Structures are given as C-alpha cells and as structure tokens.
Amino acid sequence: MANEDFKKIKLPVFFLDETGILKKADDPYFALGVVKTERPHELQRKIKILRDKLHFYEELKWNKVSPLKVEIIRQGFEAFFKDRSAVFSSVILKKDELDFKSYFNNDLLRVYRSFTVDLIKRNVGSGDNQICTIMADDYFYPDGMDLELATRGIINDHYKKVVVAGFLQINSKSS
C-alpha cells in the first residue's frame, strides 16, 4: 500500500472478555465474546456517561443481576446498537462435549488461546486494510507464558502481514 493510501486503513479495536472457568468442573459452559468497533472512544464515552449518571462503577456480572444492573445493561445495549461500527460475536463452549485431552493435551491455556485466535480471525475476515488492537480482560496466564505475543504472532503469521498491532490484558475492575 502506498503512503498516500494510509487513510484507507481501518483501525478497529477489539474488546475481549470471557465468562465461565475452563478448569472448573461444575461450570458447564465457557464463553469468549468480542466487541469490535472502529470508534471505541465514542462507545467508551457513552458507557462512562451512563455509569456516572447511575453512579455504577462495578463490573457487571451476569450471575449478579439486580434492578439497577438491568437498567445499566439495557442502556448499555442501547448505546452499543446505536454505534454503527460496533459488532459483537462470541464462541460458547459446552465443555462436556469437547475433548480437551485429545485436541489440547488438557492444556487449558492452549484451549483459551486457540479459541481466542479463532474468534479474532473470524472478526478480522480477510484482514485487508485493517490493523487491529485487542484489549482483553485479564485472564490468568502464568509467568513465562505470553498470551498477547503468542496470539498476535499466530494471527499475523496466518495473514502474512501485520493485522494485530497490539494486544493488552487489563483488569476489568480497573477500567
């Protein structure tokens, strides 16, 4: 791509989060979801205004819904659907139907990374004219293991070009 074509490059941001715990036997499902938007600042601003208006600053947990949380969820969905650049998709794993031993040698970090890569690739599409940034909820990853660099490397190697420029995990309670 020529330098004068830089305005054609899309710079979407992916917000990745999970629900459920892979290694918890009594938790039958594990899900990864991603919101992709080319205008993250607008969506974040709407959510911040909503949180300030309702004085609600805690993390939303689906298993702890209350009347106030229903209202913030409703208005949050409204803000999301008004953002024409925002897209949501997810992958839901029914853990008892998957053979983690055969496919992943029971390496649950590999399971998480593999499904993260799959979800991101499905949302990148052909990768043409896109350079993405991924922000993920802080998922336990032991020292010496690097989810961010591994995921970015796998995706960029797949496309044979830079499609993911950055991947950062943050604690969702701090943002």
Q: What function would you assign to each model-found segment?
A:
Residues 1-175:
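Phosphate-ester processing/binding pockets and catalytic centers
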